[in-house]
């Protein structure tokens, strides 16, 4: 993605036409929807043009249908699609997923204003607006599990985004929307169309209000059959197309994941830390049966601290579209807000080293996300205020996840797997415990015992401390980050973290670590730290994190054709990384759209540490 990667929101004019307020793009000089009736045009061109009423109504149980769109705009097309889905969807576990791209997203205020026109869509508009993402580049997944509907909204330039998309599932239908080719020629470049076809398959359909030559030629180059039925309103024609013909040599069919079609899957998840819990939840939300195994008790490892802070280290804005921590932070906030265990907060991130680099982020990110303000605790260090953050109560989250009717917890020590036909047997000693369709191993460093050639995960000891501060409590909705962190654990106790000792796996609570945590807060907030009780009165918990050699989680299959996957190596950011990475894992296993770009998926790939076997060159003896 190019360096000018700061997302600019759309600049709009507004015009009343036949009593409807129509938004007009200043950037492109074109309307966002038809002046005749935008909703009726959407139904005529995109829904009918892709024969979606019949196709959606006939989806089989657990079938996954995806619709791609080239310009999100006001979201009108997606809302009309969602409304149709409500009307015709079969009473089974089929799922509808929409993928859309937008270079200039509307501000939330403008989106509310634009969608206010459509009374019949207001219940859906409200749900969309509640999850409408921050104006940051990259993929934003919006999930509506009760509707069996989801949206991947990619913010950025279509010329950069479509080549970066991973093809884990072919798109079934396309809305070729966006402003007219004469107003927005970049949208209709051959590179964009090539990648739209790459993400498709035989049987994929296409529809557009435009019959411009550049679009017709771009599709015909790949053997796609085009027809031109009557357009909407005053428009004589529209484009309707289906991919029937053999593909050209330039764009060969890209293979997709081995999908498990149209049946409920039984998934075994080994390990009930945050990696295992989030993975179990992701499968269960899709209607699959999950058996979650834990050797002792859920959250007995590094995930079991009294509190987890969602505290991202932000990157320069031009890297945000493929930066795991930034993308995970946005996804995690949307994920955890569905649980009572989540508490929205703001975080004062103190600038200790390279202070100007941190302060510069406040100028790069939207002002309502990151700002510079005076710290509420006296300190000599400058800081930025991250207004979109959160804290999670791990044990409350565990209880909520385990209440899911499709998740069963079993206490057992799984020691081996036996694969046969399309199943995997899980064994505890010599006894078969379960047969599953797929297994996901989430056992941190102990995952290595269940695989050959597993990457070496480094142990990192960490201890959190908590202490009575009822005499000087901090705001409940605020945390402080300074190399360590502190915030209210409850109304009378302060939690502080965390020590960080690589290559140590001891888990005893130590006074030295309390001293370490005290020295961290004292170095930044000395006046406040002096009020705290002596460290001998502190309580704590020590645990061991698992860290991969390159600091990225290990996600996916260790062998290409295997039904056994892994998810481990989350380090100290487990609660931040887990929700997004579990969606990536599920996409690979079930054959769904992947919510991260190729570049990031390669960094997560569980096979990335395996040595590549180089073919031997033939040896020729000289004569």
Swiss-Prot record:
Region of interest called tRNA (mnm(5)s(2)U34)-methyltransferase, as start-end residue ranges on this chain: 1-244
Subcellular location: Cytoplasm
Alphabetical GO biological process terms: methylation; tRNA wobble base modification
Source superkingdom: Bacteria
Residue span of region FAD-dependent cmnm(5)s(2)U34 oxidoreductase: 270-623
Cofactor: FAD
InterPro entries: FAD-dep_OxRdtase (IPR006076), FAD/NAD-bd_sf (IPR036188), MnmC-like_methylTransf (IPR008471), SAM-dependent_MTases_sf (IPR029063), tRNA_MAMT_biosynth_bifunc_MnmC (IPR023032), tRNA_MNMC2 (IPR047785), tRNA_S-uridine_synth_MnmC_C (IPR017610)
Flavoprotein keyword on record: yes
Keyword Protein biosynthesis set for record: no
Pfam families: DAO, Methyltransf_30
UniProt-recorded Gene Ontology molecular function terms: flavin adenine dinucleotide binding; oxidoreductase activity, acting on the CH-NH group of donors; tRNA (5-methylaminomethyl-2-thiouridylate)(34)-methyltransferase activity
Enzymatic reactions: 5-aminomethyl-2-thiouridine(34) in tRNA + S-adenosyl-L-methionine = 5-methylaminomethyl-2-thiouridine(34) in tRNA + S-adenosyl-L-homocysteine + H(+)
UniProt keyword annotations, A-Z: Cytoplasm, FAD, Flavoprotein, Methyltransferase, Multifunctional enzyme, Oxidoreductase, S-adenosyl-L-methionine, Transferase, tRNA processing
Enzyme Commission number(s): 2.1.1.61, 1.5.-.-
Listed GO CC annotations: cytoplasm
Family in the record: In the N-terminal section; belongs to the methyltransferase superfamily. tRNA (mnm(5)s(2)U34)-methyltransferase family. In the C-terminal section; belongs to the DAO family.
Classification via NCBIfam families: MnmC_Cterm, tRNA_MNMC2
HAMAP family assigned to the protein according to its UniProt record, in alphabetical order: MnmC
Record's function text: Catalyzes the last two steps in the biosynthesis of 5-methylaminomethyl-2-thiouridine (mnm(5)s(2)U) at the wobble position (U34) in tRNA. Catalyzes the FAD-dependent demodification of cmnm(5)s(2)U34 to nm(5)s(2)U34, followed by the transfer of a methyl group from S-adenosyl-L-methionine to nm(5)s(2)U34, to form mnm(5)s(2)U34.
Name of the protein in question: tRNA 5-methylaminomethyl-2-thiouridine biosynthesis bifunctional protein MnmC
Protein's organism: Acinetobacter baumannii (strain ATCC 17978 / DSM 105126 / CIP 53.77 / LMG 1025 / NCDC KC755 / 5377)
